[in-house]
Amino acid sequence: MFAEVNYINCKNANEEYRMVYYSWGVQEKSSKTLVCLHGLNRNGRDWDYIAQHFVKQGYLVIAPDIVGRGNSDYLINANGYDTFNYAADILKLIGVLSLENVCVLGTSMGGLVGMAIAYLPQNPIKKLILNDIGAELEYDGLVGIASYSNSHPEFNNFSDAKDYIISLSLDFGDLPDYIWEHIARNSFQKNLTGRYELKRDVNLSKTFTNEASENKNIELWNYWGEVTIPTLVIHGENSTLLSKATISKMQKIHPLTQVVEIKNTGHAPFLYNDEHCDIISNFLG
């Protein structure tokens, strides 16, 4: 099943823009919704394989290209690339589409967006899945992400572009070539000179890299303390961003938090196979 591609119009304090989203399944025939949110430098096509599985389980699956990524608009004012602005866009998407029985699955930044929604008093989410992200982000992991988020390389051919994205993404896990091909095909676009470039605005990382330059962990415990819905943390075994100590503290604060570790991955596991789908399905019920 191919995704349907649509968009909604969004705005923040500074400007209006278009946010593209992909959908799988028929809303009228689906009693539950899974909203999938990608990582900082990624886009909604990361969820193609997860979507195929959960449509068969009766879900409507929605995966946006968060503004500045994929086929969504880029912002003129980079200050608009902010977690709470992203959360407002997702809340608008949920409202415009009249989505019901919503669960959110978010990788890295996408998980932070899910947390930002879940801590709100009028939270519309039933369950939350955090893929290698939590209430405290380790400085070493932040530096690693910042080291490539500010770069915008160009490549003469797809093969070189694919090699580049693989070299950055080895922590995703030991992925088969067809998955690497899928990741690469959806990570690049041809620019006006005919060269391959990443499908994201290089300016989107400015706020993030400023925070990462402060030589300390980013702590979000005040927000986590307000999250009350059942939550699953998927932890990359070798993650440099999410520590086991952080996960343990999260569980003490919020006892409805479950944890599953994915072996031989770092930040962050790329979710696509039967094992991953079973982990998610078992939690969603």
Predicted segments, located by residue:
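Conserved hydrolase catalytic core segment
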Residues: E100-Y139
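Short beta-to-alpha linker loops that shape the active-site pocket of alpha/beta-hydrolase fold enzymes
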Residues: D65-G70, G134, K263-G266
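Conserved HGGG/HGGXW glycine-rich cap/lid loop of the alpha/beta-hydrolase fold
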Residues: S23-N71
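Alpha/beta-hydrolase fold catalytic core
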Residues: M1-L34, K56-Y59, E275, S281-G285
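Conserved serine/cysteine hydrolase catalytic core
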Residues: N191-K249
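Conserved alpha/beta-hydrolase catalytic His-Asp/Glu region
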Residues: N156-N210
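Active-site loop/oxyanion-hole signature of alpha/beta-hydrolase fold enzymes
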Residues: K56, A63-L105, I279
